[in-house]
Amino acid sequence: MARIAGINIPDQKHTVIALTAIFGIGRTRARAICASTSIAEDAKIKELSEAQIDILREEVAKYTVEGDLRREISMNIKRLMDLGCYRGLRHRRSLPLRGQRTKTNARTRKGPRKPIRK
């Protein structure tokens, strides 16, 4: 198994699919990485030479991925909450942010129903 950005990449999969195992790299970015490194998208990871894997590592290192990306996302949410803006308040109350209805539905975001006290 090749190790890129601290993640073990599956050997049996095509390069594009294998790169999506890294948090922050989807199909589009994986295709762009393959194009810029001139590595075939349909080549399997086990077929790549060590030099090609090093090139992939360098290319992936240019992007914000894995722990850094998770930290950046959580810091953005924390910043919204500290500002006290509408989106921050919705995050704080664990409610939908983007205008969805909450009288019915929104159970995923709100969590399980709380019993009504009498």
Swiss-Prot record:
GO terms for cellular component: cytosol; small ribosomal subunit. It comes from the Bacteria. Pfam families: Ribosomal_S13. Residues 94-118 are annotated as: Disordered. InterPro entries: Rbsml_uS13_C, Ribosomal_uS13, Ribosomal_uS13-like_H2TH, Ribosomal_uS13_bac-type, Ribosomal_uS13_CS. Keywords: Ribonucleoprotein, Ribosomal protein, RNA-binding, rRNA-binding, tRNA-binding. GO terms for biological process: translation. One of its GO terms (molecular function) is structural constituent of ribosome. Located at the top of the head of the 30S subunit, it contacts several helices of the 16S rRNA. In the 70S ribosome it contacts the 23S rRNA (bridge B1a) and protein L5 of the 50S subunit (bridge B1b), connecting the 2 subunits; these bridges are implicated in subunit movement. Contacts the tRNAs in the A and P-sites. Belongs to the universal ribosomal protein uS13 family. Part of the 30S ribosomal subunit. Forms a loose heterodimer with protein S19. Forms two bridges to the 50S subunit in the 70S ribosome. This is Small ribosomal subunit protein uS13. It comes from Shewanella frigidimarina (strain NCIMB 400). The lineage of its organism: Bacteria, Pseudomonadati, Pseudomonadota, Gammaproteobacteria, Alteromonadales. The gene is rpsM.
